[in-house]
Design a protein with these regions (language model features):
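Loop-rich non-cytosolic ectodomains and luminal regions
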Residues: 1-183
């Protein structure tokens, strides 16, 4: 009953079957506090045969669009490659693409919705695969107004697996994740 009543108010629930009590897999970005959030996406090991990479799930405030992009930095923090910013209000196709960072490739796909039919919240999902552990994958989020929640979850290619991995702050001005907003 509690979940039904909160859902009716537009609350989004993200459930995980994994043990996320010590994983800083969530971020809260408040556009009134910061222009653009930057964070490092930490990856689980690729020791699972079904491992694709990470799934970044982002939910915003109803009526407030947001945009996000990913970057590839080398171990020194130098930008190697990046996607454009994708905006929830204008992305109307599924993006399936590759970033080239020297001899490495980073696979990614993006889908978005300006207003989910169930809760009117803007939504974006970015799936990213990067096997070069020396490189850093960076998520950037920007909005003019509102709040955006983000979760960093494992993505397996068999459709299951949703335990969390950390968001990290490797440099000044970056934001680390927290263990909140998981059930």
């Amino acid at each position: 009953q509690a979940i039904d009543s909160l859902s009716a108010l537009g609350v989004v629930f993200v459930a995980s079957a994994g043990n996320n009590g010590d994983a800083n897999f969530h971020l809260l970005y408040d556009a009134s506090v910061s222009d653009t959030l930057k964070t490092q996406v930490k990856f689980d090991s690729y020791s699972y045969p079904q491992m694709f990479g990470q799934c970044l799930t982002l939910w915003g405030t109803p009526g407030n669009s947001f945009e996000a992009c990913i970057q590839v930095l080398n171990s020194s923090g130098t930008l190697l490659s990046e996607t454009p910013f994708y905006l929830t209000d204008t992305l109307d196709t599924y993006i399936n693409d590759t970033l080239f960072a020297g001899a490495d490739t980073v696979l990614y796909n993006v889908l978005a919705d300006s207003a989910n039919a169930m809760n009117q919240r803007p939504f974006m999902q970015i799936r990213v695969a990067s096997r070069n552990t020396a490189n850093k994958i960076i998520l950037q989020i920007h909005a003019d107004t509102g709040i955006v929640h983000a979760w960093n979850l494992i993505e397996l290619n068999n459709g299951v697996g949703n335990w969390g991995s950390d968001f990290a702050a490797p440099y000044a001005g970056y934001t680390a994740g927290d263990p909140y907003y998981g059930i």
